[in-house]
Amino acid sequence: RMMSRGLGDVYKRQLQDQSMFYGVDKSRFKENKRAVPEKHMGPLIKTQMTRCIHCTRCVRFATEVAGVSELGAIGRGEDMQITTYLEQSMQSELSANVIDLCPVGALTSKPYVFEARPWELKKTETVDVMDAVGSNVRVDTYDWEVKRVLPLINEDINEEWISDKTRYACDGLSNQRLDTPFIKYNGKFEKASWSEVFKINKSKFENSSKDKVCGFVGDLTNMETGYIFKEFFDRTLNNNNYDSRSDNRFLDNSERENYIFNSSINGIEDADLIFLIGANPRYEATILNARIRKAFVNNNTKVISLNDSGDLTYPYKNLDGQTQTIKTIFEGSEEISKEIISASKPMIIIGESLLKLNSAEHLFNLIKNFLKKNNKFTEDWNPLNILSCDAATVGNFDLGILNNEKNLLEELKSNKFEIVYLVGQDNLEFNKKGEFVIYQGSHGDKGAEIADIILPGSAYTEQDGYFTNLEGKIQKAYKASYPPGEAKEDWQIINELAEVMNNRKLFNDKEELESSMFNYLKLQQEKQKTVNKVKTNSEFQNEKLIILLKDYYFSNVIARSSKTMIECNNSKLNIKSTGTEG
């Protein structure tokens, strides 16, 4: 073997010498080598179009799945190129999925470039919290820093897609973080120890009447945090002045079906009529909107919207946006009433904007009564759907973190409380006048700005926790990294505060907390009544229903801290008409 290898090497060298002396010194390739200049597709997608093999997967995705026809092919033969029509940023909220689809690396992730190698990353399967859909994702960390978020296949929820915000808001986990307790002295924050802030909190709670204390849970808190927060108020402070709503939203929690997406995300494809009332699913639940488009493309499902919501990526019939129109439809005196009655599986999707109206209770009960009267509630179909926007909303409602007896928000705005305890709540709007505000959270945002004491907590990737998505499915988000500095897990902070106040923890460990929480959820489900007919007590007001949308790229504290989301917002032009409006 050694001899043959040696002889082979000798002959190779001889051939190389002959080629060097007598061979052709120019390439026989006569054609021009193909090279394509890089294309601008926005802050998320880096292009190396010379690699492109013209499979047109990206074009088909943009046209068929995302529903925004902004990619196409120009030229013929070897001159063919994939490009955006106007050489501008892609406008779809699902645009970055083309990175996963591209088989050759012509389209790659711009924010992730040169960050890490795949084999260097720790991979954790978890749940997204950028909206209430609960998309399944994989979080990749390098040295406990989140580097990227990728989709996991779950055919019942997000299929294989995730929104751009889900994928790229993760850099906000490294910015504006609260990493140590703070106390405000003379209008300035100073670092403190945990024992110091706990002692001050204990003193404040003991010197205030229990009726003068209130608490609010935020939109990204997991269920364990919400439950121990509720237990802290019920058992330690002995009051129920707590809520998870940052607005005057109507909620009837006597039945679970009154606040979840009952038809399920998968059920969208089975529906034969979809009626949107005060909802804009493209921005409130991007993945759910892709399902509605899929139902339209595959089944030609009819979509009606009370409001003109702009381009939803599928055609729809829009109405005048008046509550009087809702009233006449669900009193059965409109053509649309007959369409709903004749549909075998209608879907009524109610947005949060409707639930904030003065006549929300009247309209909600009217809609539900109409559907029950016409036998639309069956064993295998529930047509009533609430489109929640935030990851923690349904879980907080399941845990009973709300107060329907008092209007806590009005009392807060009237400055009737002495102590306000905020856990991840950054959406409250009130003029502070002497209240002592305790803020517990992961980022320095609106809540931290008005606080007197800051307790640094953990983000969703830094602690295990359960979230219930808009259709009522409980999913567990797993810990992928650690909180920075002296920050702690949220449930642990509340547990230690209770121990300082009562010399006794609320729960000995997290397993005991989870067990107690699930027992409570079972009891709640047993307590919820089965009501045959909903009573209508509230009065009707004819008013214009305006869809109140958050800024899509800045909808929560993590997104607001993300540099990538800032770039996306800056590159977002007025969305061009794609010819799909109703």
Identify what each model region corresponds to.
Residues 242, 246-528, 578-582:
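Non-catalytic alpha/beta scaffold blocks inside enzyme catalytic domains
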Residues 9-37, 65-90, 108-130, 140-156, ...:
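Non-heme iron-sulfur electron-transfer modules
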Residues 92-115, 226-227:
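Amphipathic alpha-helical
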Residues 33-44, 77, 176-187, 270-272, ...:
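Gly-rich Lys/Arg/Thr-decorated short loops/hinges at beta-loop-alpha junctions or inter-strand turns
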Residues 514-582:
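Long, low-complexity segments enriched in small/aliphatic residues
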Residues 145-219:
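Catalytic P-loop NTP-binding/switch module of NTPases
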